[in-house]
Amino acid sequence: MSLEEKKTTESKEKDKALSLVLGQIERNFGRGSIMRLGDASRMKVETISTGALTLDLALGGGYPKGRVVEVYGPESSGKTTLTLHAIAEVQKNGGVAAFVDAEHALDPVYAASLGVDVENLLVSQPDTGEMALEIVDQLIRSSAVDLVVVDSVAALTPRAEIEGEMGDHVIGSQARLMSQAMRKITGNIGKSGCTVIFLNQLRLKIGVTYGNPETTTGGNALKFYASVRLDIRRIQTLKRGTEEYGIRAKVKVAKNKVAPPFRIAEFDILFGKGISTTGCLLDLAEETNIIIRRGAWYSYEGENIGQGRDNTIIWLDQNLEIRNKVESMVKEKLTEGTEVSSNSMKALNSNPANTIAVNDIKTVA
């Protein structure tokens, strides 16, 4: 037998052995327990829109389905608002969303003003961290829920701490709880296609002289299991005269397993109204030269449409036909691969690391 014939025989024997073991694994653990990556029905990760076009671009399409997402930041930075917009987007597409309100602070009136269908939103206000995470696990395993939001990790108080007295030290109990929960639910999340968003608070590490003293609550498990981590900050207060009407938020993609990380997105959050979608559109329209800015004036097709950013946003909201036309043109240019800075601010476009080509990422959901 020649060397070539020997190799062919060995290859056939290996293929036969592989087929046998794959069949045995599927009989023991069920269909789909092991597969070739090329046989997967969904090679591309589907996404849920964040409600902000600039953030969708920074994330590579939006929140990935079937993954864990962590959103953290200081108080009043827009964390809950960001997730309520995601819930509204899921419901708009006929999906089911759940909100686990561990902080007992959900405002249904505000949620409704952001477009959330509060009548059909599943809400739980658990008494303990164990109860909250068990509810999350059961919702995921049902495969009937598309999005679960947990607000927040810091409020997931272990039962031992609740049943104890004030001043009792239960060291590491919350970290152990989160570590066990992440081990348990991560596999179910991938199988069900449900996206789970954990909101988290910031704390300061004591005695840190060099480096960043900030850290998130709940230990390190969530940092490892999360496919996407978003750091949201309030960078500016929006004012008309002395009246404050919103904030400018900056989101850094601190971790992303499904698209390039470290991109930055900025957008306006208006009090009582949520993310300014028209503001995001104007930022991108300006960068793609669909709307031209000269000094304080913005012009479209050679005609001035507003003096100042706020007046231009109001004009676009009042002229929906032109707004929709501008939106279509922006999306067309982005699909063609027009480059925009990930934070949609020309002043920061001087850093090439902030620049992304939209045809290199998934289509915005």
Curated annotation (Swiss-Prot):
UniProt keywords, alphabetically: ATP-binding, Cytoplasm, DNA damage, DNA recombination, DNA repair, DNA-binding, Nucleotide-binding, SOS response
PROSITE patterns membership: RECA_1, RECA_2, RECA_3
Pfam families with a match to the protein in the record: RecA, RecA_C
Predominant location: cytoplasm
One GO term describing the cellular component: cytosol
Function text: Can catalyze the hydrolysis of ATP in the presence of single-stranded DNA, the ATP-dependent uptake of single-stranded DNA by duplex DNA, and the ATP-dependent hybridization of homologous single-stranded DNAs. It interacts with LexA causing its activation and leading to its autocatalytic cleavage.
Family: Belongs to the RecA family.
Name assigned to this protein: Protein RecA
